[in-house]
């Protein structure tokens, strides 16, 4: 039985368009002789659909989409489609996270999710009820009946601990051990995280060895709001060895054919099929027009991170209908990295940058911004804010009893720049990219309605030290191949030593440095990571050897900045815990 893994990039809520995308994949798979096509979790909706699942009109549209798909399916090929299965007569949550088998002429629900994640960015118990029994699909192919275990994403996560707690008490894999399976299938929508692709393979390998059957894993790919899905579907054999690897961060359609002799050892195997061996690492079907493969191999950590951010920006702009992007280019390292990511995601011809110098802007920063723009080939404009500063001072002096001073004057500069950027983005119909990093968002070293302005915080989940490391890698020779693949200049330095080595500064007053207000980032970031991602208490950090006064200061800044983060644009999630939908702390709290 030949299987096809359809790694798809869905638009959330576009049931008609997603259905057409599934159908196109099925037609290509049928041409390759596939009996069954696998699509990701909730593939008809796109993941996560959130409160769209509560709209009755969309549940009705789902039925029409499934019927349309069944009417157009090629004969002899079925597809497993992720969908929401209504529970008749039930109060909310009144749905199952489910899988439908769609074949020519009809469809039926064949599997339901058992483990519903309700942590971090996941909130499935708001919408779904867990299934109580395992799901097994019997499917005929080439004169043989195959028993396929069906699991959905979290159902596989029963062997590892993540974020300091076990993900589930139940064990769907154990409940499948008595089912005499031939294959285990997993339909997933698992977001990107550093090292997560390898973790998924370890989980699948463990399930394979427990059940004694191959595991076929298909994952969603693409960016949906702040979440980035890296794809990287795969097949492991009954011993847990990798036999097929799908593309990383791109749509893909791959075929794999298990040996007829695979499956439970006590199952009868037709003699004529016993010698039919599974191709090890079956070739990927050439991508359809518009489907580009970055790499079939899992990239190294810096490249993973860069490509995840590029994919997130590209899909956010495309799915929100923006034709281009705008950012402020200060000559600092944060905006430089965002400019690189934007050019890789959209093409330099669709990215525009503005320098907005004040009397405190250094000549070096202006030159560095111009040099970077020239290397990237993006359009750079200049809008000095000194005249606007004078006008604001004149307008505010009567109300304040004197000219604005201190933080008020500094924040005015940031807000003037934010206003200019929003005006240009509004006029040109461009996506304004916020350039702040996670360290700044954590401690509130940013200005509401100023440098926080934007539709997407590209590096809002990268600590400042991570920004430095990624930029250092981008300027190193080992990044050349990745840069070339992303359409960036591959020769020489990209960010530039002048930008990488200058002391961080907002340049809002003479000789200002970030270190005037904050600890060095090499000291600050480990404390922030412990407080934010590990949810450690200040007492735990002090007990581990951290300076008590410093920890208390950082914890206080983190707590007091909550009101700013609540008004920040969505930040692409690439860490274990990002500010956004997975960070739910009160503003008014002790």
Model feature map: region roles:
Residues 1-328, 344-345, 380:
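Enzyme catalytic cores with a strong preference for nitrogen-chemistry domains
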Residues 146, 212-213, 238, 262, ...:
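ATP/NTP-dependent adenylation/nucleotidyl-transfer catalytic domains that generate, transfer
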């Amino acid at each position: 039985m030949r299987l096809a893994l359809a790694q798809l990039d869905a638009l959330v809520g576009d049931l008609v368009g997603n259905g057409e995308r599934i159908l196109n994949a099925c037609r290509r798979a049928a041409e390759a002789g596939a009996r069954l096509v696998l699509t990701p979790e909730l593939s008809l909706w796109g993941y996560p659909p959130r409160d769209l699942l509560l709209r009755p009109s969309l549940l009705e549209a789902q039925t029409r989409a499934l019927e349309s798909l069944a009417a157009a399916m090629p004969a002899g090929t079925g597809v497993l489609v992720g969908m929401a299965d209504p529970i008749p007569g039930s109060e909310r949550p009144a749905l199952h996270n489910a899988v439908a088998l769609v074949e020519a002429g009809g469809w039926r629900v064949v599997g339901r999710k058992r483990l519903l994640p309700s942590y971090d960015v996941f909130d499935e118990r708001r919408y779904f009820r867990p299934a109580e029994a395992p799901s097994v699909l019997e499917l005929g192919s080439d004169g043989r009946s195959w028993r396929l275990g069906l699991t959905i994403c979290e159902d596989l996560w029963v062997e590892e601990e993540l974020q300091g707690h076990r993900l589930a008490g139940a064990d769907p894999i154990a409940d499948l051990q008595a089912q005499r399976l031939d294959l285990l299938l997993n339909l997933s929508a698992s977001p990107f995280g550093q090292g997560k692709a390898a973790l998924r393979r370890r989980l699948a390998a463990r399930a394979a060895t427990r059940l004694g059957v191959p595991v076929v894993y298909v994952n969603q790919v693409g960016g949906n709001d702040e979440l980035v899905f890296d794809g990287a579907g795969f097949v492991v054999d009954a011993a847990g060895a990798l036999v097929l690897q799908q593309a990383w961060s791109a749509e893909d359609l791959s075929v794999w054919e298990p040996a007829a002799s695979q499956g439970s050892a006590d199952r009868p195997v037709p003699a004529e099929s016993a010698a039919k061996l599974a191709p090890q690492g079956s070739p990927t079907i050439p991508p359809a027009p518009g489907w580009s493969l970055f790499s079939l191999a899992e990239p190294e950590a810096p490249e993973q991170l860069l490509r995840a951010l590029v994919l997130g920006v590209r899909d956010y702009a495309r799915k929100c209908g923006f034709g281009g992007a705008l950012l402020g280019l200060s000559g600092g390292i944060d905006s430089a990295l965002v400019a690189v990511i934007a050019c890789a995601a959209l093409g330099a011809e669709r990215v525009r940058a503005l320098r907005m110098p004040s009397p405190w802007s250094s000549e070096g920063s202006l030159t560095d911004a111009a040099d970077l723009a020239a290397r990237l080939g993006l359009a750079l404009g200049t809008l000095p804010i000194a005249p606007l500063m004078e006008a604001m001072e004149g307008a505010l002096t009567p109300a304040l009893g004197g000219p604005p001073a201190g933080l008020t004057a500094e924040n005015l500069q940031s807000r003037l720049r934010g206003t200019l950027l929003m005006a240009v983005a509004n006029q040109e119909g461009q996506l304004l990219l916020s350039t702040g990093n996670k360290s700044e968002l954590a401690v509130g070293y940013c200005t509401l309605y100023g440098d926080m302005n934007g539709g997407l915080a590209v590096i809002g989940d990268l600590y400042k030290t991570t920004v430095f490391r990624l930029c250092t890698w981008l300027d190193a020779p080992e990044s050349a191949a990745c840069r070339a693949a992303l359409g960036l200049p591959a020769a020489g330095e990209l960010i530039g030593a002048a930008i990488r080595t200058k002391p961080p500064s907002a340049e809002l007053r003479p000789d200002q440095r970030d270190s005037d207000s904050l600890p060095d980032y090499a000291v600050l970031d480990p404390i922030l990571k412990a407080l934010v991602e590990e949810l450690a208490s200040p007492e735990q950090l002090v007990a581990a050897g951290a300076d008590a006064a410093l920890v208390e200061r950082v914890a206080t800044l983190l707590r007091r900045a909550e009101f700013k983060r609540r008004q920040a644009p969505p930040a692409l999630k690439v860490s274990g815990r990002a500010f956004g939908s997975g960070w739910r702390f009160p503003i008014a709290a002790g």
